[in-house]
Amino acid sequence: MKRVIFHIDVNSAFLSWSAVKLLTEGGPDIRLVPSAVSGDPSDRRSIITAASIPAKKLGIKTAIPVSMALRKCPNLVIVHSDWEWYRHCSTSFIDICRLYSPVLQQFSIDECFIDMTFRLYRKDAAEVARALKDEIKEKLGFTVNVGVGSNKLLAKMASDFEKPDKVHTLWQDEVQEKMWPLPAGDLLWVGKKTRERLSAYGIYTIGDIARLPENSLARIVGKKFAAQMHDNANGIDNEPIITEFQEAKSISVERTFAKDIVNPEELDREMFKVACTVAHRLRRQGFRCTCVSMFIKFTDFSVAQKQCQISGPTDVTALILNEARRMLGEMWDGTAPIRQVGIGLSKFTKEETEQLMLFEDPKLSFYREWDRKYDEQKSRSEDVKFLAYERKSPGEPQG
């Protein structure tokens, strides 16, 4: 039987949820005008955490300072973020999705997957998806997109098609027509640097990736990432829905600063310490991870977070730190004061696939030896003097 997976994604979640609250209080619908959410609208150094569609058309993006947003749009309506209310909206939205299928995986505060394979009762999948979308809108007052596909990848890709308040399908036999013409950077797990590297080799679309021989792709992005990328570009994804009762354990470490940090080098040193600690805990439990998440809290208590899947299981501090740095660069403009940072690891395995990678990157043996020395010191005392990685190495702390 063909799998049927829904991916449900709230449209401009924080902005939509703030709009619903204002409407219940008799206010205007800020979704219809240039508007944004910020931790502290009165502080021009505060960061934009969400923007309405009219605001996005004016160039208002998340993670830019309020001062910059106001220069782009002097009449921008800015509202204060309300995390307690957001959690309430998230729970309500998930509860409705769970009524359609108990096999649910919450992917973030504003999106989830549900397995509808045995829940359609001979109904059309897109028809059921529209019913779910409309029920959320009617009962909760905000809109979602629902992507429908035969696996998680296709469902998520489909939900990112035209927004808002839409249902889109992306079945395996629709991949060439609907997915292949999209830019390579739209493919799940393809970030900015990978996109730029692909572009340098004349690979511009998802179809270009799909048609490229896997061994040729491996020479560009590395053997392990190439296999996953090639499968994804062809719509192949066998990952199951992981319910909250099945989820693997995660490890995270946060660090709150006595004084807000604005200096990039100082922040990098603190991230280095966090990465060392969280990677040490991972190794101590005998696991490797395939997912890294990065969390930052600004001085106005607004929060930004990202997660990424890495090309192969690892417990190496340098590789984990590299991913955290990359995600930080996507969330922080380098000037907004930061109060707290955190790094999380999840999707654990005991695979030792890095043994093959040692022959591809000689530095890995150096990083492993560094980690061994760190773990040895840590076993003797919690007070570890942080060693510096070799200069020019990917794991090198910047100060």
Region roles according to the model:
Residues 118-119, 151-155, 297-301, 346-351:
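Short, internal active-site loops enriched in acidic
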Residues 1-234, 280, 355, 364-379, ...:
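Gly/Gly-Pro- and Ser/Thr-rich, intrinsically disordered tail segments characteristic of DNA damage-repair
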Residues 107-111, 149-152, 246, 287-291, ...:
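Short Gly/Ser/Thr- and Asp/Glu-enriched loop/turn motifs at secondary-structure junctions
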Residues 186, 194-338, 350-353:
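DNA-contacting surface of Y-family translesion DNA polymerases
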Residues 41, 255, 298-300, 347-349, ...:
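A broadly conserved detector of short glycine/acidic/proline-rich loop/turn motifs that flank catalytic sites
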